[in-house]
Amino acid sequence: MSLRNKVTLIGYTGKEVEMVNFDNGNVKASVSLATSDYYTNAKGEKVEETQWHNLVAFGKVAEIFQKYVPKGKEIAIEGKLTYRSYDDKDGVKKYITEIKVDEILLLGGK
């Protein structure tokens, strides 16, 4: 049996792409992505529920983000779910969930 970690999302970027350049020449792009779902509540009203996802990309994919993905751009991505942690300035362990993007498709919009 093959186990797979694969995420596919379509949504709108919520901020400008943040770039980090590493000493070894590699680059990292970070951006948030909003996806929305709708449901009907007990009063019969349609309610929109938005989820925010943290995306990271490296290398050529990061360069595509930098050049072609402004705030508010509709994109489709494929990648894998990743988890990491760090200790903040007060020594408290913080946990981060991110999607490491392997493929990006630029869609309509801005």
Where are these regions (language model features)?
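Single-stranded nucleic acid-binding surfaces, predominantly the OB-fold ssDNA-binding core
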Residues: 1-110
